[in-house]
């Protein structure tokens, strides 16, 4: 698999210095560095499983915007936009609703990861159409978890959900 890493504030060897970690946290938010670590775990697994026919673009910034697409995977099955999460706990995904489940009660989460992954997929699809790239299957948005402490109960979610125990199966 060919990896194109466009992560901002990284050194030539791919590491992030302490100063750049602080800059990234201030510029992109507190979850920036944990998100990068989760992405790296996912990329390591995908790199072992996928062949040379795949290209992975990491943290691509779309032209004329500040939208950062975490992972774009291009290969024979098509184009997939992968949003990697490091959250833990028990969640429910029903259509476009995303929230925590505790004591049998559902509570909407402050950040809806399903909608975020879905919107990233739509943004990439629109971006590619403007660049005159057409794909028969379109762009598939995926929410991928690398944390085994995350449980998701799903009922027809708007994006494909891949839990940590199924990442290798997803890649094969």
Positions of the model-derived regions?
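Surface-exposed interaction regions that form or flank ligand-binding interfaces
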Residues: 1-67, 76-79, 85, 90-93, ...
